[in-house]
C-alpha cells in the first residue's frame, strides 16, 4: 500500500486523494521515497500535475526549521525523467533537498517500480517495463496484427513484430556457421549450440524461490515463470 503521509502537508480526505497528500518531507528515508514514487505511478498510470496542490501548501515551509520539504516550488510533474539513480518518475526541480538526493543515490535499490497487483511484488528498473508487466494482470492487448483475416492482439510491441514474421516470412537472425536463418533470436541461439556441442546447455535459470529449474530457451523460462505467477495469484485469492 501507499506509505501513510504522516509528514505531508495535510491528511487525505474524501476530497483529497492519498496521492495528492503525499508531499513528503525529509523524515522519509530513501526506501520510503522509492516506494512512494513507484506506487504513485502504478496506481495512477498517467502523469500527475500537482502544481496546484503545492501552491496552497509551500508558503508555510519558510518558517519551519525542523524539516525541509523534499519537493518544494510552485510546479512539478511526476513522470519519466530520473533525478535519483534508479528512479524514473521524479522530475529534476530546484527544490529537491541535496541531502535526499545523496541518500537516494547511495541506495542499493535497483528496481524501484513495484507491481501493486495483489499477490505480485515484481519490481522493475523502468516504468515502461512495469506497465508492460501490468498487462498480464489486466489482460490489455493494445497491439493488433493488421494482416488480413488475422486480428490477433498482443500486450507488447515486440510480440507483435515477432508474430508478423509468420506472415511475412522474414528471418532476420542468421547462423554464422551454416547461414541458416531464423525468425527469432532465441531459436538461433538454440540452433547455434548444435555447432558448439552444447546441445544440453540450459543457461536460463528460474529465479523463483526454491525452484532450480533451468531451460535452453528464454521463452521456455518465461512460460515456466508465468506458471509460478498464476499459482501464487491463486494462492493469494484463497487466503
Swiss-Prot record:
Motif (9aaTAD): 43-51
Domain of life according to the entry: Eukaryota
Recorded family membership: Belongs to the EGR C2H2-type zinc-finger protein family.
PANTHER family registered for this protein in UniProt: KRUEPPEL-LIKE FACTOR 11, KRUEPPEL-LIKE TRANSCRIPTION FACTOR
Domain notes: Binds to DNA motifs with the sequence 5'-GCG(T/G)GGGCG-3' via its C2H2-type zinc fingers. Starting from the N-terminus, the second zinc finger binds to the 3'-GCG motif, the middle zinc finger interacts with the central TGG motif, and the C-terminal zinc finger binds to the 5'-GCG motif. Binds double-stranded target DNA, irrespective of the cytosine methylation status. Has reduced affinity for target DNA where the cytosines have been oxidized to 5-hydroxymethylcytosine, 5-formylcytosine or 5-carboxylcytosine. The 9aaTAD motif is a transactivation domain present in a large number of yeast and animal transcription factors.
Subunit and partners: Interacts with ZNF224 via the zinc-finger region. Interacts with WTAP, AMER1 and SRY. Homodimer. Interacts with WTIP. Interacts with actively translating polysomes. Detected in nuclear ribonucleoprotein (mRNP) particles. Interacts with U2AF2. Interacts with HNRNPU via the zinc-finger region. Interacts with CITED2.
Task of the protein: Transcription factor that plays an important role in cellular development and cell survival. Recognizes and binds to the DNA sequence 5'-GCG(T/G)GGGCG-3'. Regulates the expression of numerous target genes, including EPO. Plays an essential role for development of the urogenital system. It has a tumor suppressor as well as an oncogenic role in tumor formation. Function may be isoform-specific: isoforms lacking the KTS motif may act as transcription factors. Isoforms containing the KTS motif may bind mRNA and play a role in mRNA metabolism or splicing.
Additional facts recorded: Presence of the KTS motif hinders interactions between DNA and zinc-finger 4.
Protein name: Wilms tumor protein homolog
Organism: Sminthopsis macroura (Stripe-faced dunnart)
Amino acid at each position: 500500500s501507499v506509505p501513510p503521509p504522516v509528514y505531508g502537508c495535510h491528511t487525505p480526505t474524501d476530497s483529497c486523494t492519498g496521492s495528492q497528500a503525499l508531499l513528503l518531507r525529509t523524515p522519509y528515508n530513501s526506501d520510503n521515497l522509492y516506494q512512494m514514487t513507484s506506487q504513485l505511478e502504478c496506481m495512477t498510470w498517467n502523469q500527475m500535475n500537482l502544481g496546484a496542490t503545492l501552491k496552497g501548501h509551500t508558503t508555510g515551509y519558510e518558517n519551519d526549521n525542523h524539516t525541509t520539504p523534499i519537493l518544494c516550488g510552485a510546479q512539478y510533474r511526476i513522470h519519466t525523467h530520473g533525478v535519483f539513480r534508479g528512479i524514473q518518475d521524479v522530475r529534476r526541480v530546484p527544490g529537491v533537498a541535496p541531502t535526499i538526493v545523496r541518500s537516494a543515490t547511495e541506495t542499493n535499490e535497483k528496481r524501484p517500480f513495484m507491481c501493486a497487483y495483489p499477490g505480485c511484488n515484481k519490481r522493475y528498473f523502468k516504468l515502461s517495463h512495469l506497465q508492460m508487466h501490468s498487462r498480464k494482470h489486466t489482460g490489455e492487448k493494445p497491439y493488433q496484427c493488421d494482416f488480413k483475416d488475422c486480428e490477433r492482439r498482443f500486450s507488447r510491441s515486440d510480440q507483435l513484430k515477432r508474430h508478423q514474421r509468420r506472415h511475412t516470412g522474414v528471418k532476420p537472425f542468421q547462423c554464422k556457421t551454416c547461414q541458416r536463418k531464423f525468425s527469432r533470436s532465441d531459436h538461433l541461439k538454440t540452433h547455434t549450440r548444435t555447432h558448439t556441442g552444447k546441445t544440453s546447455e540450459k543457461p536460463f535459470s528460474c529465479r523463483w524461490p526454491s525452484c532450480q529449474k533451468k531451460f535452453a530457451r528464454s521463452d521456455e523460462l518465461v512460460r515456466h515463470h508465468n506458471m509460478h505467477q498464476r499459482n501464487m495469484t491463486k494462492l493469494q485469492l484463497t487466503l
